[in-house]
Protein backbone atom coordinates (compact mmCIF):
# COMPACT_ATOMS: atom_id res chain seq x y z
CA UNK A 1 0.00 0.00 0.00
CA UNK A 2 1.47 3.37 -1.04
CA UNK A 3 2.06 5.95 1.66
CA UNK A 4 0.12 9.21 1.47
CA UNK A 5 2.50 12.05 0.49
CA UNK A 6 3.35 14.33 3.41
CA UNK A 7 2.49 17.99 3.72
CA UNK A 8 5.47 19.93 5.07
CA UNK A 9 6.25 23.53 6.07
CA UNK A 10 9.63 25.04 5.11
CA UNK A 11 10.97 28.12 6.89
CA UNK A 12 13.85 30.42 6.07
CA UNK A 13 15.75 31.50 9.21
CA UNK A 14 17.25 35.00 9.04
CA UNK A 15 14.56 37.71 9.36
CA UNK A 16 11.85 35.08 8.86
CA UNK A 17 12.21 32.93 11.96
CA UNK A 18 14.31 35.48 13.83
CA UNK A 19 15.44 39.08 13.68
CA UNK A 20 18.89 39.45 12.15
CA UNK A 21 21.52 37.01 10.92
CA UNK A 22 22.07 33.72 12.75
CA UNK A 23 25.58 33.45 11.28
CA UNK A 24 26.37 36.96 12.52
CA UNK A 25 25.24 35.97 16.02
CA UNK A 26 27.50 32.91 15.88
CA UNK A 27 30.44 34.99 14.66
CA UNK A 28 29.75 37.53 17.40
CA UNK A 29 29.88 34.76 19.99
CA UNK A 30 33.13 33.49 18.51
CA UNK A 31 34.63 36.99 18.56
CA UNK A 32 33.65 37.49 22.20
CA UNK A 33 35.41 34.23 23.02
CA UNK A 34 38.61 35.25 21.26
CA UNK A 35 38.33 33.13 18.13
CA UNK A 36 39.13 35.98 15.76
CA UNK A 37 39.69 39.74 15.45
CA UNK A 38 37.48 42.76 14.83
CA UNK A 39 38.87 42.88 11.29
CA UNK A 40 37.68 39.34 10.62
CA UNK A 41 34.14 40.10 11.73
CA UNK A 42 34.06 43.48 9.96
CA UNK A 43 35.00 41.81 6.66
CA UNK A 44 32.06 39.45 7.04
CA UNK A 45 29.68 42.24 8.03
CA UNK A 46 30.63 44.35 5.00
CA UNK A 47 30.27 41.41 2.60
CA UNK A 48 26.89 40.52 4.10
CA UNK A 49 25.74 44.16 4.01
CA UNK A 50 26.71 44.61 0.36
CA UNK A 51 24.81 41.46 -0.52
CA UNK A 52 21.68 42.52 1.36
CA UNK A 53 21.69 46.03 -0.11
CA UNK A 54 22.39 44.94 -3.67
CA UNK A 55 18.86 43.75 -4.39
CA UNK A 56 20.20 41.48 -7.13
CA UNK A 57 21.93 38.13 -7.40
CA UNK A 58 25.66 38.88 -7.39
CA UNK A 59 27.75 35.72 -7.57
CA UNK A 60 30.93 37.55 -6.63
CA UNK A 61 29.42 38.94 -3.42
CA UNK A 62 27.91 35.56 -2.57
CA UNK A 63 31.34 33.98 -3.08
CA UNK A 64 32.86 36.56 -0.72
CA UNK A 65 30.29 35.77 1.96
CA UNK A 66 30.88 32.06 1.42
CA UNK A 67 34.63 32.54 1.78
CA UNK A 68 34.29 34.72 4.87
CA UNK A 69 31.97 32.19 6.50
CA UNK A 70 34.39 29.33 5.78
CA UNK A 71 37.28 31.27 7.29
CA UNK A 72 35.34 31.65 10.53
CA UNK A 73 35.44 27.92 11.14
CA UNK A 74 38.74 26.84 9.58
CA UNK A 75 40.97 25.05 12.07
CA UNK A 76 38.42 24.95 14.89
CA UNK A 77 37.17 21.73 16.46
CA UNK A 78 33.59 20.86 15.55
CA UNK A 79 32.81 19.87 19.14
CA UNK A 80 33.93 23.28 20.43
CA UNK A 81 31.83 25.14 17.85
CA UNK A 82 28.84 22.94 18.67
CA UNK A 83 29.11 23.80 22.36
CA UNK A 84 29.45 27.48 21.51
CA UNK A 85 26.41 27.24 19.23
CA UNK A 86 24.29 26.22 22.22
CA UNK A 87 25.49 29.25 24.16
CA UNK A 88 24.90 31.56 21.19
CA UNK A 89 21.39 30.20 20.78
CA UNK A 90 20.55 31.00 24.40
CA UNK A 91 22.25 34.42 24.36
CA UNK A 92 21.23 35.80 20.98
CA UNK A 93 19.02 33.58 18.85
CA UNK A 94 16.28 32.75 21.35
CA UNK A 95 15.58 36.41 22.31
CA UNK A 96 15.49 37.34 18.60
CA UNK A 97 12.85 34.80 17.55
CA UNK A 98 9.70 36.16 15.95
CA UNK A 99 6.96 34.72 18.14
CA UNK A 100 4.43 35.09 15.33
CA UNK A 101 6.55 32.83 13.13
CA UNK A 102 7.01 30.33 15.96
CA UNK A 103 3.23 30.17 16.38
CA UNK A 104 2.78 29.46 12.67
CA UNK A 105 5.40 26.70 12.80
CA UNK A 106 3.88 25.17 15.93
CA UNK A 107 0.47 25.18 14.26
CA UNK A 108 1.91 23.01 11.49
CA UNK A 109 3.40 20.66 14.09
CA UNK A 110 0.04 20.49 15.88
CA UNK A 111 -1.46 19.24 12.61
CA UNK A 112 1.18 16.49 12.38
CA UNK A 113 3.04 18.29 9.60
CA UNK A 114 6.83 18.29 9.47
CA UNK A 115 8.63 21.61 9.87
CA UNK A 116 12.01 22.10 8.18
CA UNK A 117 14.39 25.03 8.25
CA UNK A 118 15.96 25.90 4.88
CA UNK A 119 18.81 28.36 5.24
CA UNK A 120 22.21 29.52 4.02
CA UNK A 121 23.27 29.34 7.67
CA UNK A 122 25.75 26.52 8.48
CA UNK A 123 23.80 23.29 8.84
CA UNK A 124 25.30 22.61 12.26
CA UNK A 125 23.73 25.81 13.61
CA UNK A 126 20.50 25.26 11.68
CA UNK A 127 20.23 21.73 13.16
CA UNK A 128 20.67 23.17 16.65
CA UNK A 129 17.95 25.79 16.12
CA UNK A 130 15.57 23.17 14.73
CA UNK A 131 16.27 20.83 17.64
CA UNK A 132 15.76 23.51 20.29
CA UNK A 133 12.44 24.52 18.73
CA UNK A 134 11.20 20.96 18.33
CA UNK A 135 11.17 21.09 14.53
CA UNK A 136 11.71 18.10 12.27
CA UNK A 137 15.08 19.07 10.83
CA UNK A 138 17.10 21.57 8.83
CA UNK A 139 18.71 22.03 5.45
CA UNK A 140 21.72 24.33 5.54
CA UNK A 141 25.14 25.07 4.12
CA UNK A 142 27.45 22.15 4.94
CA UNK A 143 30.95 22.94 6.21
CA UNK A 144 33.55 20.21 5.69
CA UNK A 145 34.95 18.50 8.79
CA UNK A 146 38.00 16.21 8.79
CA UNK A 147 39.25 14.47 11.92
CA UNK A 148 36.84 16.56 13.97
CA UNK A 149 38.19 19.89 12.65
CA UNK A 150 36.64 22.34 10.18
CA UNK A 151 38.73 22.57 7.00
CA UNK A 152 37.42 25.95 5.83
CA UNK A 153 35.77 24.37 2.78
CA UNK A 154 32.15 23.70 1.92
CA UNK A 155 30.60 20.43 0.84
CA UNK A 156 28.53 21.48 -2.15
CA UNK A 157 27.27 25.02 -2.64
CA UNK A 158 26.06 27.77 -0.35
CA UNK A 159 22.38 26.98 0.27
CA UNK A 160 21.11 30.21 -1.22
CA UNK A 161 18.55 31.31 -3.80
CA UNK A 162 17.76 28.59 -6.36
CA UNK A 163 19.86 26.08 -4.39
CA UNK A 164 17.21 26.12 -1.66
CA UNK A 165 14.54 25.03 -4.14
CA UNK A 166 16.81 22.26 -5.42
CA UNK A 167 17.48 21.02 -1.86
CA UNK A 168 13.78 21.02 -1.00
CA UNK A 169 12.92 19.03 -4.13
CA UNK A 170 15.58 16.45 -3.29
CA UNK A 171 14.24 16.18 0.27
CA UNK A 172 10.73 15.74 -1.13
CA UNK A 173 11.89 12.79 -3.22
CA UNK A 174 13.65 11.20 -0.25
CA UNK A 175 10.80 11.62 2.24
CA UNK A 176 7.71 11.40 0.05
CA UNK A 177 6.72 15.04 0.50
CA UNK A 178 3.85 16.50 -1.50
CA UNK A 179 5.29 19.89 -2.47
CA UNK A 180 2.08 20.95 -4.21
CA UNK A 181 0.32 20.70 -0.85
CA UNK A 182 3.19 22.07 1.26
CA UNK A 183 4.06 25.52 2.63
CA UNK A 184 7.14 27.74 2.47
CA UNK A 185 7.86 30.95 4.37
CA UNK A 186 10.55 33.58 3.71
CA UNK A 187 11.37 37.28 4.00
CA UNK A 188 13.64 37.56 0.97
CA UNK A 189 13.11 37.91 -2.77
CA UNK A 190 16.17 35.69 -3.15
CA UNK A 191 13.93 32.85 -1.91
CA UNK A 192 11.27 33.23 -4.60
CA UNK A 193 12.44 29.95 -6.23
CA UNK A 194 11.88 28.20 -2.88
CA UNK A 195 8.45 29.78 -2.48
CA UNK A 196 7.50 28.80 -6.02
CA UNK A 197 8.50 25.18 -5.33
CA UNK A 198 5.46 24.66 -3.07
CA UNK A 199 1.74 25.08 -3.48
CA UNK A 200 1.33 27.42 -0.52
CA UNK A 201 3.98 30.18 -0.51
CA UNK A 202 3.91 32.75 2.28
CA UNK A 203 5.89 35.96 2.84
CA UNK A 204 7.00 36.88 6.36
CA UNK A 205 8.48 40.34 7.04
CA UNK A 206 9.10 40.66 3.28
CA UNK A 207 11.73 42.87 1.71
CA UNK A 208 10.45 45.34 -0.88
CA UNK A 209 10.94 43.10 -3.91
CA UNK A 210 9.31 40.09 -2.27
CA UNK A 211 6.40 42.21 -1.06
CA UNK A 212 5.79 43.45 -4.61
CA UNK A 213 5.98 39.89 -5.94
CA UNK A 214 3.71 38.51 -3.19
CA UNK A 215 1.08 41.19 -3.80
CA UNK A 216 1.17 40.52 -7.53
CA UNK A 217 0.83 36.75 -6.99
CA UNK A 218 -1.74 37.15 -4.18
CA UNK A 219 0.48 35.33 -1.68
CA UNK A 220 -0.43 35.84 1.98
CA UNK A 221 1.88 38.23 3.84
CA UNK A 222 2.67 38.19 7.57
CA UNK A 223 4.50 41.24 8.88
CA UNK A 224 5.50 40.92 12.53
CA UNK A 225 7.80 43.96 12.36
CA UNK A 226 4.84 46.33 12.47
CA UNK A 227 3.34 44.54 15.44
CA UNK A 228 6.64 44.83 17.31
CA UNK A 229 6.92 48.52 16.45
CA UNK A 230 3.37 49.16 17.63
CA UNK A 231 4.09 47.40 20.91
CA UNK A 232 7.16 49.59 21.44
CA UNK A 233 5.04 52.70 20.87
CA UNK A 234 2.04 51.47 22.83
CA UNK A 235 3.88 50.30 25.95
CA UNK A 236 5.04 53.72 27.24
CA UNK A 237 1.74 55.34 26.21
CA UNK A 238 -0.20 52.67 28.07
CA UNK A 239 2.06 53.15 31.08
CA UNK A 240 1.34 56.88 31.12
CA UNK A 241 -2.41 56.28 30.82
CA UNK A 242 -2.34 53.84 33.74
CA UNK A 243 -0.39 56.36 35.82
CA UNK A 244 -2.83 59.12 34.86
CA UNK A 245 -5.78 56.90 35.73
CA UNK A 246 -4.26 56.23 39.14
CA UNK A 247 -3.76 59.95 39.81
CA UNK A 248 -7.33 60.75 38.80
CA UNK A 249 -8.92 57.96 40.81
CA UNK A 250 -11.12 58.90 43.83
CA UNK A 251 -8.76 56.98 46.11
CA UNK A 252 -5.89 59.19 44.95
CA UNK A 253 -7.96 62.31 45.64
CA UNK A 254 -8.70 61.17 49.19
CA UNK A 255 -5.00 60.50 49.84
CA UNK A 256 -4.19 64.01 48.58
CA UNK A 257 -6.57 65.76 51.04
Short names for language-model regions:
Residues 2-6, 83, 90-257:
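C-terminal cap/substrate-recognition subdomain and adjoining C-terminal extension
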Residues 14-17, 32, 72, 159, ...:
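Short N-terminal micro-motifs specific to bacterial/archaeal maturation
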Residues 18, 61, 117-118:
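Short, surface-exposed helix-loop/turn micro-motifs enriched in polar/charged residues
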Residues 21, 76, 163:
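Conserved active-site and cofactor/substrate-binding residues in soluble primary-metabolism enzymes
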Residues 23, 46, 64-66, 148-153:
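Acidic/polar active-site rim loop that often engages polyanionic ligands
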Residues 51-67, 245-257:
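Low-complexity, charge- and small-residue-enriched intrinsically disordered regions
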Residues 62-99:
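Metal-dependent phosphoesterase signature
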Amino acid sequence: MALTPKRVAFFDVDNTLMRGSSLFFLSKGMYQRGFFTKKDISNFVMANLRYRLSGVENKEEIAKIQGAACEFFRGHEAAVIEKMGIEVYDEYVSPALWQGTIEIANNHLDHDEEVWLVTATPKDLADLIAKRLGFTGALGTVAEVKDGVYTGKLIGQLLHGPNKAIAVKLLAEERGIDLANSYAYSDSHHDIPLLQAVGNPRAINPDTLLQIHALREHWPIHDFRRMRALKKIAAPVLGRLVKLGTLLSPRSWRRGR
